[in-house]
Amino acid sequence: MDPPPRPRPHRVAVLLLLLLASSPAARAWKKDEFRNCNQTPFCKRARTRAPHSLDAPLSLDAASLAVATDGSLTASLSHPSRLRPLLLRLSALPPHALRLQIDEDYSSNTPPHRRFQVPDVLLPDVEARTLHLPQPKTSAAGVSTFALSSDVDVVVKHDPFELTVRRAGSGAPVLSFNSHGLFDFEPLQESKQEGETWEEQFRSHTDTRPRGPQSITFDVSFYGADFVYGLPEHGSTSLALRPTRGPGAEESEPYRLFNLDVFEYLHESPFGLYGSIPFMIAHGDGPSSGFFWLNAAEMQIDVLAPGWDGASSTENGRIDTLWMAEAGVVDAFFFVGSEPKDVIKQYISVTGTPSMPQQFAVAYHQCRWNYRDEEDVAGVDSGFDEHDIPYDVLWLDIEHTDGKRYFTWDHSAFPNPEVMQGKIADKGRKMVTIVDPHIKRDSSFHLHEEATAKGYYVKDATGKDFDGWCWPGASSYPDMLNPEIREWWADKFSYENYKGSTPTLYIWNDMNEPSVFNGPEVTMPRDAVHYGDVEHRELHNAYGYYFHMATADGLLKRGEGKDRPFVLSRAFFAGSQRYGAIWTGDNSADWDHLKSSIPMVLTLGLTGMTFSGADIGGFFGNPEPDLLVRWYQVGAFYPFFRGHAHHDTKRREPWLFGERRTALMREAIHMRYSLLPYYYTLFREASVTGVPVMRPLWLEFPDDKETYNNGEAFMVGPSLLAQGIYEEGQKSVSVYLPGEELWYDLRNGSPYKGGVSHKLEVSEDSIPSFQRAGAIVPRKDRFRRSSTQMVNDPYTLVIALNSSSAAEGELYVDDGKSYDYQQGAFIHRRFVFADNKLTSMNIAPKNLGNKKFSTECVIERIIILGVSSGSKKAIVEPGNHEVDIELGPISLRSGSSSVAPTVRKPNVRVVDDWTIRIA
């Protein structure tokens, strides 16, 4: 056999870079590797344009305004400085959503390429749900008005073009589009004009831009708003988006949405990270509102400080924003709601609700780059048992593969993967392996050979298979825009194709921004070409979305449609919530990254991605033991709860830091497991309504201004509030408890007044956390090895009475794994305490399906906070039998001595209707 060819010099250099890529020093944040606005021509052009500065602004042709047969409103827009007119389409979705679409009008001049409109993100029935708009009323002054609903109407000014969504009756504006005249729409061109240069240079990379500049810019204003939120993903300790331009702006760069592989990212920066969701929510004294732009090209968004336009005075309660995108079309949604939950629900109504996870996925995950071999896996697994720490999932990173060839195993380290998974599964646990999009260019690798033969790779600008570098070395990337290729990829997860996989193995998608080590900004060149002759610049932010989708579909097919997939993805886009979880990427083991994790996870929840979390302890670096403890105490509240670390870090399993700290981390994990019934119920709510599991305080207290920019405390559902500890050696913390009712300390039941801040002493054993008066929270208090082993355990109900001596809560239960719940196989109960009676009632919708679910689980304890301990008996109906009320522990945590009146062993089934009356 001939020796392998000698690598070309530039390949040798790149290989050296690749070998160094995993070095912390090599891959730490390097500002000059990534573009800023001034280095991004479309952003620089748009940012220098003054309001209403165009000589011939955008205008609407009144004669073209008409209601189409599908009920939408259409018109022609003219932009004299551009090549061809634009076509406007307005449509409505219930209850108060307006869709605005603007594209080039191709009717008179069809170019060789059309602008890309992102498919597959909106729910398939969005068009079918479109309402029939009435014929607008047009005034002599050139203003058209039509009703969006009984509460909201739309005003369209013709010349210059401006659109305003306002409250009907009062006429108060809620949102406006192009009120500052900043709209620009660069048309596709067939050839360069004289003197034009289309190519762009960044560092050593040239973007050929064969279709010329094609950016879009416009302004959107939010009225009655104190703050705006959203636009993940970026690192920040602020929940609200900070002004980026104008007097007193706290940032100098716009918020960038461009999915990138950023190692050890900055905790405080508007720079884009791994995912992009172009959705913004505004909240304040007026109605809540939201704006979503369906566009997968790079975006830059300015939040403009009052006076940004040089005006001597500013309109109170208005926030102006500037939206800039490199390519695409305008496909935007305006949402109006009486409160922020209404806005979230409307956004979810077009992009889809989060998928309902399996029960195990809501529990604790243990990960590291990398657990070395089967012996290491067995040792970690047994270590959790030996130290009485539950966990549900053990993860394997890239080193488990044969030379970074995904869907394979390194059989020298993992000779019996199915046996290994079986031993983990015997304890009710699962495993996860990593599958990234870069496919090793190796003629002996069947996946590469098949993808090459079928033409399934993304192409470079010359039409050849794109060849970039990532963990395996030379790599190519499947073109996930093509439905045929997604189907092919999904088939690779079958047991036949993924040898060594079992039904208890799930998947992790990393590096799917996509990451290309030798590419511009560590990603794919913008002039690479996808299915349908779509340039990568048009698709970039959705590549990871499609990869996530195809992987989830693969697990769905593997399970014959019966097993809910679990797929964690690093990259994401609007709609990714339908396919699984995400995490915040390569954070650092420092207090700042712990603090920034809360606004990041809250922002993800507001924009649909409720199943998210940050690496416990920080991915990069070695956390001080006290930091690691605090991170577990905060992270136990994340929707996605996983410990993870870089391979250059010291091992950090929870039992490696001394007996005291092990006990503290064990206690944090135990707390999460005891609250799994509550979390699972919240995930059910999210899967139906889109309301996130982990929430900003203002989502539950929308009228309380003290909550509007609180990014340190957070709600878990409607009933629990927690405040992290984010400083080393912190002795006290100020905690604001909103509302007029009491809050009860989760640890000891102590009551605290609502509507004020409390300065609390900090203890090492937990972070401040509280249950809201008026709430009932279900728990399971028997500690097991995994959540699977808790299935038949009894429940505890914790009732926190409000000033009316009342409380309520919910419990949702299904089989924790299948889709039978979609045919009615679940239990959904509401618990109501009033007039000294606790009542359980069924709230599951009828006629959902013919499948049933039942359980013999009972209520073992009912803890009542906020009541005197005078009563000694309770009467259970039906049956009219007495049970004892006695003082019992509020928490089963180690060393807890706090007690409260407790109904002991009423033993009523959660599936039944019943009443328990305090005698």
From Swiss-Prot:
Entry annotated with the keyword ATP-binding: no
Keywords: Endoplasmic reticulum, Glycoprotein, Glycosidase, Hydrolase, Plant defense, Signal
Function: Cleaves sequentially the 2 innermost alpha-1,3-linked glucose residues from the Glc(2)Man(9)GlcNAc(2) oligosaccharide precursor of immature glycoproteins. May be required for defense response elicited by pathogen-associated molecular patterns (PAMPs).
Signal peptide positions on this chain: 1-28
Location of the protein in the cell: Endoplasmic reticulum
GO biological process: defense response; N-glycan processing; polysaccharide catabolic process
Glycosylation sites: 802
EC id: 3.2.1.207
Family listed: Belongs to the glycosyl hydrolase 31 family.
Broadest EC class assigned to this enzyme: hydrolase
Quaternary structure annotation from Swiss-Prot or TrEMBL: Heterodimer of a catalytic alpha subunit and a beta subunit.
Protein name in UniProt: Probable glucan 1,3-alpha-glucosidase
Protein's organism: Oryza sativa subsp. japonica (Rice)
Catalysed reactions listed for this entry: N(4)-(alpha-D-Glc-(1->3)-alpha-D-Man-(1->2)-alpha-D-Man-(1->2)-alpha-D-Man-(1->3)-[alpha-D-Man-(1->2)-alpha-D-Man-(1->3)-[alpha-D-Man-(1->2)-alpha-D-Man-(1->6)]-alpha-D-Man-(1->6)]-beta-D-Man-(1->4)-beta-D-GlcNAc-(1->4)-beta-D-GlcNAc)-L-asparaginyl-[protein] + H2O = N(4)-(alpha-D-Man-(1->2)-alpha-D-Man-(1->2)-alpha-D-Man-(1->3)-[alpha-D-Man-(1->2)-alpha-D-Man-(1->3)-[alpha-D-Man-(1->2)-alpha-D-Man-(1->6)]-alpha-D-Man-(1->6)]-beta-D-Man-(1->4)-beta-D-GlcNAc-(1->4)-beta-D-GlcNAc)-L-asparaginyl-[protein] (N-glucan mannose isomer 9A1,2,3B1,2,3) + beta-D-glucose; N(4)-(alpha-D-Glc-(1->3)-alpha-D-Glc-(1->3)-alpha-D-Man-(1->2)-alpha-D-Man-(1->2)-alpha-D-Man-(1->3)-[alpha-D-Man-(1->2)-alpha-D-Man-(1->3)-[alpha-D-Man-(1->2)-alpha-D-Man-(1->6)]-alpha-D-Man-(1->6)]-beta-D-Man-(1->4)-beta-D-GlcNAc-(1->4)-beta-D-GlcNAc)-L-asparaginyl-[protein] + H2O = N(4)-(alpha-D-Glc-(1->3)-alpha-D-Man-(1->2)-alpha-D-Man-(1->2)-alpha-D-Man-(1->3)-[alpha-D-Man-(1->2)-alpha-D-Man-(1->3)-[alpha-D-Man-(1->2)-alpha-D-Man-(1->6)]-alpha-D-Man-(1->6)]-beta-D-Man-(1->4)-beta-D-GlcNAc-(1->4)-beta-D-GlcNAc)-L-asparaginyl-[protein] + beta-D-glucose
GO cellular component: endoplasmic reticulum
PANTHER family: ALPHA-GLUCOSIDASE, BCDNA.GH04962
Endoplasmic reticulum recorded as keyword: yes
GO molecular function: alpha-glucosidase activity; carbohydrate binding; Glc2Man9GlcNAc2 oligosaccharide glucosidase activity
Active site, renumbered: 510, 513, 586
Main subcellular location: endoplasmic reticulum
